[in-house]
Amino acid sequence: MKSLLILLLALHPVFAQDAHHEGVVKRGDNVMGFSHEKTTHHFELLKDGGLIRADADNPNDVESRDQIRMHMQHIASMFSSGNFNAPMLIHEKTPPGVPTMKRLRKVIQYRIEPTPTGAEVRISTANSQALEAVHQFLRFQIEDHQTGDSEAVR
């Protein structure tokens, strides 16, 4: 019995992490307007910023593709104005980097680009503080969405 209790206590962080990720997915579906089960997210760190990308898993799923494009347009517009409510709602906390990204919003550019099955938001800046904040934000996204993307700058 004692061994079972020790095992359960050791596994508690794993269960808590899984429950948190399930919450991120569920809240994300509501906030973004498309299903995580039908789409794939990617986050990339670049020398001058980064990328937020989402694509429909099925190339014929035009509904998901169009919802992704609409969401990415909203993200680019909201982030440009310093509004980061969507990530805060999805993750239930302020992601790292957001306070600095809000403060330095005038030196960060957000450009949406359609992809064949979705869209991406290209984030760029020449400001070193803003760049560090963007990278913190994207690393958090990679971890919280469990995308498996590299956290290295390319």
Can you annotate each of these PLM segments?
Residues M1-S3, Q17:
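Generic structural signal for short, solvent-exposed loop/turn connectors between secondary structure elements
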Residues S3-H12:
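Sec-dependent N-terminal signal peptides
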Residues A16-R154:
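Intrinsically disordered, low-complexity terminal tails/loops enriched in metal-binding residues
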